[in-house]
């Protein structure tokens, strides 16, 4: 695609998946192109997407394992071929797929002799295993073997200090990085002032999500990162009138909690879960990540608390309040604050 002029192209950017394949259960590959881009834009987009794909995509993994009567992680257990450390390393490699937030419990409880694989993990309903054949341990004798596990959804690489826990549990260095690798290349075409660039993007994932899903999530995260600048202008922020500092419009949920209690003392706020409020999936996930599970949790937060939540946007707060006004059987309009 060729632009008529460099400074003001009327052509719309288009992207396309040109190749997609599954090399194994834990290795997906996708190749995408984006064009036409002006000179330098492909590098800007490529760098931003690569960083977002490798560092901002959330993944689910096992973060802790608890053994019974094991003095330290370098111990061996009678009747098991692998040491405790080797079992922990095998658990670290297990690839999980889920949309859960917070910590969940799982377990393994089997009787030998037999091989233990990922298929033997007893998981909560919201979690599934990508490759059930992943090895964990080999029981060589007829023994009962049980492990309690903790599962968490996070992003990036999380490490914990190694120490002996009295309850027999050991932390696992969690690698919550579903995207295994990202490459990008740039192809220039056209002549003279009609030159433009094509961005080629290659993505490899661990099978917990497809490269296309990873690209969508990374793009969404980048958009959310820049939205505050757009909303500042939309809300009429005047930097000339506020030369010294910027004060966001007042929005304190604590005041509304007081009003709520005044108008409807009988409402059990701690029994109303945010799942019942018909929030968008994006807003719901933001709140769950911040351990906000009930209406009481939500209404106890200030605007500053909410805006500190990762990926929480200005428009999310308005959506939350609009939803409360629509569905709660009380008159909250009296103390409603303007946006």
Curated annotation (Swiss-Prot):
Its EC number is 2.7.7.6. Pfam families: RNA_pol_A_bac (PF01000), RNA_pol_A_CTD (PF03118), RNA_pol_L (PF01193). Keywords: Chloroplast, DNA-directed RNA polymerase, Nucleotidyltransferase, Plastid, Transcription, Transferase. The keyword Ribonucleoprotein does not apply. Residues 1-233 are annotated as: Alpha N-terminal domain (alpha-NTD). Residues 264-339 are annotated as: Alpha C-terminal domain (alpha-CTD). It catalyses: RNA(n) + a ribonucleoside 5'-triphosphate = RNA(n+1) + diphosphate. It is found in: Plastid, Chloroplast. GO terms for cellular component: chloroplast; DNA-directed RNA polymerase complex; mitochondrion. GO terms for biological process: DNA-templated transcription. The keyword Transport does not apply. Its main location: plastid. In plastids the minimal PEP RNA polymerase catalytic core is composed of four subunits: alpha, beta, beta', and beta''. When a (nuclear-encoded) sigma factor is associated with the core the holoenzyme is formed, which can initiate transcription. DNA-dependent RNA polymerase catalyzes the transcription of DNA into RNA using the four ribonucleoside triphosphates as substrates. Belongs to the RNA polymerase alpha chain family. This is DNA-directed RNA polymerase subunit alpha. The gene is rpoA.
